[in-house]
């Protein structure tokens, strides 16, 4: 950081204002880097500069070797979010951790995220987690009940699942004849 950029940042940092920053890391090293940061922060007695360090992940169920396993997917691979008080000392601590390639922003002036940007990240994380949960809720051949629309309370069998559009093709009996209808995931529920 240059003296001028540090001075600009210090004007808000001296008030002990913690803001969210994005740190770029080596690919696949996010967890190790977070652990290294936490160790160095504690070792250098700088916990008062840092409020939170997050790796934006969400859990999904995947089938591996015939078994359903829960795995973590990264919303922003190679990035870590840090809520910190940006000072020359805290900047150097983060920047000098092995695997950190830099802060989002210019080379000398890290750019803090706005409230709307950080809210957008958290909303995306929540949406991804919800979508991942919904995408594994239904299986072909499963019996479901329609909960919304003109076929509400009808029972049917899942014929197709469109993960991309969060839609199902469900076969319901209308006048004694199996009729396929397309529904959103949130328009059906599993039968117990």
Swiss-Prot record:
Please give the SMART domains that the UniProt record associates with this protein: KOW, NGN
Q: Name one Pfam family in it.
A: NusG
Gene3D superfamilies, alphabetized? 2.30.30.30, NusG, N-terminal domain
The record's InterPro entries line, in alphabetical order, gives: KOW, NGN, NGN-like_dom, NGN_dom_sf, NusG-like, Rib_uL2_dom2, Transcrpt_antiterm_NusG, Transcrpt_antiterm_NusG_bac_CS
Q: Which GO terms describe its cellular component?
A: cytosol
- On whether Transcription is a keyword of this UniProt record, the answer is yes
Where is each KOW domain found?
A: 140-168
Which keywords appear in this protein's UniProt record, sorted alphabetically? Answer: Transcription, Transcription antitermination, Transcription regulation, Transcription termination
Lineage top rank: taxon: Bacteria
Q: An example of a Gene Ontology BP annotation on this entry?
A: regulation of DNA-templated transcription elongation
Write out the function statement from the record: Participates in transcription elongation, termination and antitermination.
Q: Which family does it belong to?
A: Belongs to the NusG family.
NCBIfam families xrefs = nusG
What is the name of this protein? Answer: Transcription termination/antitermination protein NusG
């Amino acid at each position: 950081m240059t003296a001028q950029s540090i001075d600009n940042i210090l004007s808000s940092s001296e008030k002990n204002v913690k803001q969210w920053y994005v740190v770029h890391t080596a690919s696949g090293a996010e967890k190790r880097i977070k652990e290294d940061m936490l160790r160095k922060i504690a070792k250098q007695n700088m916990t008062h500069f840092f409020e939170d360090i997050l790796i934006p992940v969400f859990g999904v169920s995947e089938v591996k070797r015939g078994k359903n396993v829960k795995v973590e997917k990264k919303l922003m691979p190679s990035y870590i979010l840090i809520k910190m008080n940006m000072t020359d000392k805290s900047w150097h601590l983060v920047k000098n951790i092995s695997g950190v390639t830099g802060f989002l922003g210019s080379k000398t002036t890290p750019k803090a995220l706005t409230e709307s940007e950080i809210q957008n990240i958290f909303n995306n994380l929540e949406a991804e987690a919800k979508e991942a949960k919904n995408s594994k809720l239904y299986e072909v051949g499963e019996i479901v009940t329609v909960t919304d629309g003109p076929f509400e309370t009808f029972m049917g069998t899942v014929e197709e699942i469109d993960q991309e559009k969060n839609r199902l093709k469900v076969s319901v009996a209308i006048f004694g004849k199996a009729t396929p209808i397309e529904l959103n995931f949130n328009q059906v529920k599993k039968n117990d």
